């Protein structure tokens, strides 16, 4: 497998073509951003931590029967992935009230949600990722009704698997976002699962161990990511 030209450069990852038209290289960079790119910093080792963390989580999900784009980890900061036809919506599940849900609905942060809530958001930085519903998604041709149901099914299956995994490590999976795409006609989990795209709290102290440390200026971002990885048994060094 040969890495070739850059296909896309996002806020924290770069995607490269390879000599296989069905495979891409996903590079995790040290760039860290928040508020649709308004706040950006470089954090040492973050790319390495997120790449290894993502490989660990995706492998656990594959073991649970959830198809993902991940093929293999190539280096400290790069992974080989399938080239998915991405669906331009984010699937968000919330187990505990935090973030935009608190701001939108005026509920107390930390309130446990039973059942968990599910929301769709359009991936569009210029519009600040607006919330959309199933009717929007079908009307604008972003996904079919069948694909929507499959994304919801897989998103909740991820919740079952990861809530238990994190709970065993003394962590509370507050919320997370997932992105899906199509490969050979099958819906698969794409993008990443790292502390950049979920909220994780210490189950006892409620200490935040995710990107909210960056958003809220709490410091110790990579240290928190390392702590989560250590509790899960992710080998970093």
From Swiss-Prot:
State the top-level EC class.
ligase
Keyword Transmembrane attached = no
Q: Which GO terms describe its biological process?
A: 'de novo' IMP biosynthetic process; cobalamin biosynthetic process
Give the EC number(s) listed in the UniProt record.
Answer: 6.3.2.6
Spell out the Pfam families in the cross-references. Answer: SAICAR_synt
Biological or metabolic pathway of the protein: Purine metabolism; IMP biosynthesis via de novo pathway; 5-amino-1-(5-phospho-D-ribosyl)imidazole-4-carboxamide from 5-amino-1-(5-phospho-D-ribosyl)imidazole-4-carboxylate: step 1/2
Q: Which reaction does it catalyse?
A: 5-amino-1-(5-phospho-D-ribosyl)imidazole-4-carboxylate + L-aspartate + ATP = (2S)-2-[5-amino-1-(5-phospho-beta-D-ribosyl)imidazole-4-carboxamido]succinate + ADP + phosphate + 2 H(+)
The lineage's top-level taxon is Bacteria
GO MF terms here are: ATP binding; phosphoribosylaminoimidazolesuccinocarboxamide synthase activity
Q: Which keywords are on file for this protein?
A: ATP-binding, Ligase, Nucleotide-binding, Purine biosynthesis
Instruction: Please give the GO cellular component terms listed in this UniProt entry.
Output: cytosol
Q: Of which family is this protein a member?
A: Belongs to the SAICAR synthetase family.
User: What NCBIfam families does this protein's entry cite?
Assistant: purC
What is the protein name stated in its UniProt record?
Phosphoribosylaminoimidazole-succinocarboxamide synthase
Query: What is the protein's species of origin?
Result: Idiomarina loihiensis (strain ATCC BAA-735 / DSM 15497 / L2-TR)
Q: Which gene encodes it?
A: purC
